[in-house]
Regions:
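Transmembrane alpha-helical segments that form the membrane-embedded catalytic/substrate-channel core
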Residues: 19-27, 107-115, 181-198, 269-278
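Juxtamembrane inter-helical linkers in multi-pass membrane proteins
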Residues: 33-50, 198-220
Length: 312
């Protein structure tokens, strides 16, 4: 039964991810006094891209064609490890912090290789920037979640949720707040949101993620965009269910699963509104200021770990 719930959780993430991106776009447009595209616009864009012909550069190798599938598969795999509806889940023994970080790095690694493969100037520039951001961001993800693992006594994501549900007082600890702030900053960087990157631009010299996918078209581009939306949802799930796990089901009952789904949707809505408001209030940072922001998040995560050690 737990395997069915895990499969349903992955399918739910696949279905909700494009809508989450569309919701953020729609709310940003409303906050800027624009009508904006409908929430379901990303679904229409994916449908259009899957129907389009694939155009590949003559200089591209097999790696360029294989990368979108690896990126998409790694993103889908993370949805099965993160506790979304129930904890512990069927793949709980494999849902370790280290596995999650390496799956996230796998997608970033192949995306950077795909940007370098055709030999275009924009792709190489974006790949170098993406690797720089990932080198600063991924250790912060590990440290932020590790601070929670210290309190729970396990690096298993499901066990962290169960331990937090058993002792709700730890959610108001200083280490908890510092880890949440660190992971929130990393979420902005890893998903290409403002102030680190602007997801609405395609021809800026300062772009990061979009520079690596300029050579892609058709179903390859659709898979990469879908994977990026799934990655955003996974980070939202980490922020919502690891730090505020109320609503996550501990038993496989119909009422518990429905409550878990409703609470998860509510958390997604709150985080989407937060991102939309933030992106309408802040400007994009200069590229050389991005490492400074990520260094702040790393220090916050380090303080969270130190706080967890001191307050044990």
């Amino acid at each position: 039964m737990r395997y069915l719930v895990t499969a349903g959780q992955a399918c739910l993430a696949l279905l909700l991810a494009p809508g989450l991106v569309g919701l953020i776009r729609w709310m940003k447009a409303r906050l800027q006094n624009r009508r904006g595209a409908p929430v379901w616009q990303p679904y229409l864009e994916l449908q259009k891209l899957f129907r389009k012909e694939v155009v590949v550069s003559r200089n591209a190798s097999w790696l360029f064609r294989a990368a979108p599938y690896v990126i998409f598969a790694s993103a889908v795999a993370t949805t099965a490890l993160v506790p979304v509806l129930v904890a512990p889940a069927a793949l709980d023994r494999m849902g370790d912090l280290v596995v999650l970080v390496y799956l996230l790095l796998l997608g970033t690694f192949f995306l950077a290789l795909a940007g370098l493969d055709p030999g275009s100037a924009f792709g190489g520039m974006g790949a170098s920037r993406e690797v720089t951001v990932a080198a600063l961001a991924e250790p912060t993800v590990a440290l932020a979640v590790f601070s929670l693992a210290l309190s729970a006594g396990s690096t298993n994501l499901g066990q962290i949720v169960v331990a937090t549900l058993a002792d709700p007082a730890r959610t108001v600890s200083p280490g908890h707040a510092l880890a949440f702030a660190a992971l929130f900053i990393v979420t902005l960087a890893e998903t290409g949101r403002l102030p680190v990157d602007n997801p609405a631009t395609h021809l800026e010299l300062t772009m990061i993620h979009e520079a690596m996918v300029l050579e892609y078209s058709g179903r390859y581009l659709a898979l990469i965009q879908w994977a990026a939306a799934i990655k955003l949802l996974v980070f939202f799930a980490l922020l919502g269910n690891l730090f505020v796990p109320w609503g996550v089901a501990r038993e496989l009952t119909t009422e518990g699963l429905l409550l878990a789904a409703a609470s998860f949707l509510l958390k997604l809505l709150v985080l989407a509104v937060t991102i939309a408001v933030l992106e309408t209030r802040v400007a994009k940072l200069r590229l050389f200021r991005v490492p400074e922001l990520l260094s702040v998040s790393f220090v916050l995560a380090l303080l969270a770990v130190s706080s967890s050690f001191l307050l044990r």
